[in-house]
Amino acid sequence: MDLPGPIHDFLLVFLGLGLILGGIGVVLLTNPIYSAFSLGLVLVCISLLYILSNSYFVAAAQLLIYVGAINVLIIFAVMFMNGSEYYKDFNLWTVGNGFTLLICTSIFGLLITTITDTSWYGIIWTTRSNQIIEHDLISNSQQIGIHLSTDFFLPFEFISIILLAALIGAITVARQ
């Protein structure tokens, strides 16, 4: 989306805060329904970030597949679970939580140092200079369609056969 700088930055910060708060909600909320709704918020914010970076096809696929199907399936599965088992034994802190906190904190620290030490200016200019000339002639979804019907035709058909076999297997297992 071609927005002025301050509006783009505001939306980027707003969506980033939505991602962070939704992620915290997924991890910290004890009710699985609320946790699934927080996951839906995270997936919608990711889709809006794709729109903000001019990837409209990926944003539409994110909304349709993850928010529309996967999150609804998670909520559907959570509603069938027994909700009383989550409130019986609630330990505030265990050894596994401390170990996980240590690993996640160290990964976060390494990620922050990597981001601050990387020269992003050179990366931006090298990706812009290597753009394909076809980019201006046809849209992203047309490029995806052309590649799926020419270069990736065989893998695309192979994946569709594997998904069909998995669907038939799931129906067979569900009937038994």
From Swiss-Prot:
NDH is composed of at least 16 different subunits, 5 of which are encoded in the nucleus. It comes from Morus indica (Mulberry). Its EC number is 7.1.1.-. GO terms for molecular function: NADH dehydrogenase (ubiquinone) activity; quinone binding. The chain crosses the membrane at residues 10-30, 32-52, 61-81, 92-112, 152-172. NDH shuttles electrons from NAD(P)H:plastoquinone, via FMN and iron-sulfur (Fe-S) centers, to quinones in the photosynthetic chain and possibly in a chloroplast respiratory chain. The immediate electron acceptor for the enzyme in this species is believed to be plastoquinone. Couples the redox reaction to proton translocation, and thus conserves the redox energy in a proton gradient. This is NAD(P)H-quinone oxidoreductase subunit 6, chloroplastic. Belongs to the complex I subunit 6 family. Keywords: Chloroplast, Membrane, NAD, NADP, Plastid, Plastoquinone, Quinone, Thylakoid, Translocase, Transmembrane, Transmembrane helix, Transport. It is a multi-pass membrane protein. GO terms for cellular component: chloroplast thylakoid membrane. Pfam families: Oxidored_q3. It catalyses: a plastoquinone + NADH + (n+1) H(+)(in) = a plastoquinol + NAD(+) + n H(+)(out); a plastoquinone + NADPH + (n+1) H(+)(in) = a plastoquinol + NADP(+) + n H(+)(out). InterPro entries: NAD(P)H-Q_Oxidoreduct_6, NADH_UbQ/plastoQ_OxRdtase_su6, Nuo/plastoQ_OxRdtase_6_NuoJ. It comes from the Eukaryota. Its main location: plastid. It is found in: Plastid, Chloroplast thylakoid membrane.
